[in-house]
């Protein structure tokens, strides 16, 4: 009798678990616990950790600092739009047409950088340039996304700057509406909403932007879908040879704007169409040695902050903790010795630069204080 009742309850509970889809949660937790138990608690010494990571992926050690002298000469344009291009013949015409067909009285220029393309990208750019006086084209050997953007930064002669990726496109009144908001509010940055689309243009997601003044914390970390006062962009380069080079926006550009108490404004309008690339960096990084670049670029940009007179703060410290969690999401599939080396390096980084901020309020902080790798994994997986 007891056996029959037990079987009945087992069936009932199993049905509830299946109905609520808790079986997936239990399965995930089972594999997570199994993974935790398989980890060794031993950690490498700091020098050994550095050597392990250096053998896995050399640190580019590329600074973002750009020495830019102030000029009293009036800017030639209201806006420079910087478009890095590499093998994008399939999407380039849509991008350029969207930039040219702007309904605005503001004066703007399109700076296109052909970054060593091997398809017809260069020819398309030359044809558009010959037919449109406000398109400037640079042809260069392949230097990567950062190198292409930096070539555009060298040519800036405008009050504001906009970055557009060459497989994306903008709405017809993007330039006019954003510059109007920038001038009326004396804003250092104006950010709009965006739509994420598939490779063939189908809408995946719409992200609205509220109208009005924003805090720095409300900005997305991407250089796109916003316009920025050129003085801030002319003071930086995108670091070369890293993944996640956009980190310079949050760690340097936004920090400079916050330091100057400059205004940040949002327009309640879809401005930008961002094309999702299933073969892009964020999708392929998990299997690449460059996935550890979050560690490298965070360390380099932290050093660069001193060159800009940027100091530590509670907000910056919390951003670093967020970055550490993000790094684990990018490296979790790498070998254990790599993840342990990254943990040791981040631990040294925190203790060297944020000892006064470290507390035991969160699992993540506690893991670094106690040098507890298992706790670190748990925090990165479950702690918000």
Which ranges hold each PLM region?
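Glycine-rich, basic loop-to-helix element that forms the pyrophosphate-binding segment
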Residues: 140-156
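Cell-envelope/extracellular polymer assembly enzymes that use nucleotide-activated donors
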Residues: 77-80, 98, 109, 248
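Conserved donor NDP-sugar-binding/catalytic core segment of glycosyltransferases
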Residues: 173-204
